[in-house]
Amino acid sequence: MNRLTGKWTTWGVAGILMAVFWLSCQTGSALSLPTLAPSDSTPEVEITIQIQNRRFEPGVLQVRVGQKTRLIFKNQDAELHAFVPGGLLSGISFQVSGTGAPEFNLKGLRRVLLPSSGQTDILFVPGQPGVYPFFCDLPGHVMSGSVVVKE
């Protein structure tokens, strides 16, 4: 192969790669998921979880991939509790608000401590289907539940 043919091959491959990249960006914008930005007016689903008698009620939550979701945890007990999200919020954006105290580690949200009569809201958009267990990790509190994310 001579030098001229090699240059044309290199430029041809580069052009094809640029065209594929451009087309993938164009089609991706039409399929965008909701965001957490205040300007995004996508309606959200609200699910209230009561914490009472050392239980999460309801214990099983069902949400959909791509649906903006707000989980509202209300601690009705006279004692402190925690919400440990497991892998539910891994790799996605989320917002935490309310009277709970969020704790973070290198992987993201470790847990939220919920005082008696406290409330914490967690806003997120589920990205992957699956079953995501959550629990309270305080000593002696055997409380757990799960979020089922469906397509």
Regions found by a protein language model. Give the residues of each.
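N-terminal edge beta-strand
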Residues: 40-68
